[in-house]
Amino acid sequence: MDYYDFWKKELDLDKKYKLKGFSRGSLRTGFILLPCRIFLDAGVPSPIKPNAILITHGHQDHIDCLYNHLLDNNEKVQVIGTNTLIDNLKDYLNSCRTMNVGYKIKFDKWAPKSILNNLIINIDNIKYYIETIKLDHEVECIGYGLSEIRNKLKNEYNKLSSIELANLKKNNIQIIEEILYPILFFCGDMNYTSLLILPFNSYPYFIIECTFFQLEHIYDARSKKHLHIVDLIPYFQKYINTIFILIHFSCRYTKNQINEYKKKYNFSNVIYWI
């Protein structure tokens, strides 16, 4: 695969935000939200430099390119994850740096940020609210809900003229309030039991794994704590106003096979990220 082939597929989420990326189970997973350049996992080489990186868990196919993402940046990039993951990534990045220079050294070209439940980050003078949900996987794993924080005129002042609003401002009356503009939810790898706790009604887009399709692979899904298409179908049917972006297909399926499953399991609110 050519270097730039990873980034050929893209999707306009709305008038402002665009999603690009690539994902195959046990191979590579990584997405970029543009124009803010927020990376969702770090398993794919990229010509674009990140402003922030959200890491769901530490499996190699999700962090394989983290070290390279962090090099040659003018500013230290925010890398967000759980406390345990951040501690492990420190050791991982130190080892990467050591192997590249040939002697023991610490890697310091990053800004690690541990997240417990939620976090606010600032990118290009825009604030983003990040919420997390713990997922059941082979290792500690979380999903990320991402929203932009926008300013909105309070409802009680909607009918006032610009002159009246200006007078209120002069009197130090707060006429603006912050609201959340949900963008997407990015799920890490997970067992089917985690589906019960996900906020499908709260985000317009849900990027979620669908590792297995064949019925005989349900056992593999259970033993490896991944999702099978049959786990997801009830949620496609229930949350018809949510768009599901399916990723992380097992490498045992060819592209042609996945397209056949796409025809078989065809839902108007489902996008197969092939």
Q: Which stretches of residues belong to each language-model region?
A:
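Active-site environment of divalent metal-dependent phosphoester hydrolases
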Residues: 47, 60-63, 87-88, 138-140, ...
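Active-site-proximal loop/helix segment associated with metal-binding centers of metalloenzymes
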Residues: 123-215
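Metal-dependent catalytic neighborhoods of phosphoester/phosphodiester hydrolases
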Residues: 65-72, 91-92, 254-262
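Divalent metal-coordination and catalytic microenvironments
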Residues: 40, 57, 79, 130, ...
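Extended recognition/assembly regions associated with phosphoester-bond processing machinery
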Residues: 1-29, 115-118, 130, 185-187, ...
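Binuclear metal-ion centers of metallo-dependent hydrolases, dominated by the metallo-beta-lactamase
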Residues: 102-124, 194-274
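Conserved beta-strand hairpin/beta-sheet module of binuclear metal-dependent hydrolase folds
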Residues: 1-51, 142-146, 152-153, 176-187, ...
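Active-site metal-binding motif and surrounding structural segment of the metallo-beta-lactamase
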Residues: 39-87
